[in-house]
Regions:
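Alpha-helix C-terminal capping segments
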Residues: 49, 130-133
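Short, solvent-exposed secondary-structure boundary/capping segments
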Residues: 113-121
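Short, charged/polar, Gly/Pro-enriched secondary-structure boundary elements
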Residues: 125-129
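Internal active-site segments that recognize and position negatively charged phosphoryl groups
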Residues: 132-159
Length: 205
């Protein structure tokens, strides 16, 4: 059994660990199967939820659609928070244990099964401010998972293909998420994402 949810069109299948079929040991293969958009249900990732302990209302384990593990997804964590609230395991304040540590979310609004959360991802750690990958300038960050950020003037190029190459670039032994950022004005950015283990996840902000 699963619930399907999305945050900014980044979609996930969510399953309670206690409801996994007995004997299901190869979670990587299961993730690839159910996340396949042609032969499975289809999703960018699979989240396994467990009841929390201590400060945490719940805990999540994230599997990408290619069967790899990831520390955290901000969108996925918000989806998990919605399920915890719906299950009565949390109310306005939600604490979730992730592979990148304990994350705090606050429920801002709810309309039926549509939830709006504010989430503290923590400070971004700049690992390299002026890097060059694939002959392009970029910034390398860590926000609980690795990020490579390119500033672009437009999106009229094969940015998903570039994202796929950068994801597996030798500079990133554990692979990386890739973001392409266009500055519209001092207050507005347009962003496209190539997600590690999932590819172009359709999120546009």
């Amino acid at each position: 059994p699963f619930t399907k949810a999305h945050g900014a069109r980044n979609d996930f299948l969510l399953t309670w660990r206690s409801q996994l079929p007995p004997g299901l040991d190869d979670l990587a293969a299961a993730a690839r199967t159910i996340c396949n958009r042609h032969t499975g249900v289809g999703a960018d990732g699979w989240l396994l939820l467990s009841p929390g302990s201590g400060e945490a209302n719940g805990a999540i384990e994230l599997w990408n659609s290619d069967g790899s593990r990831s520390e955290i997804s901000g969108n996925g964590t918000r989806c998990a928070a919605a399920l915890l609230v719906e299950a009565g395991l949390a109310e306005q304040d939600v604490n979730i244990a992730t592979g990148a540590g304990l994350k705090h979310l606050r429920l801002l609004a709810r309309e039926g099964r549509v939830f709006s959360f504010e989430m503290n991802m923590g400070a971004a750690a700049v690992e390299e401010l002026r890097a060059t990958i694939e002959d392009r300038d970029c910034v390398i960050l860590n926000v609980g998972n690795p990020q490579c950020v390119f500033f672009v003037d437009h999106f009229d190029f094969e940015w998903p293909a570039l994202g796929a190459r950068v994801e597996r670039h030798p500079s990133f032994p554990n692979r990386t998420n890739v973001s392409f950022v266009r500055v519209l004005d001092r207050h507005t950015l347009e962003v496209r994402f190539f997600e590690r283990g999932a590819g172009d996840d359709q999120t546009q902000i």
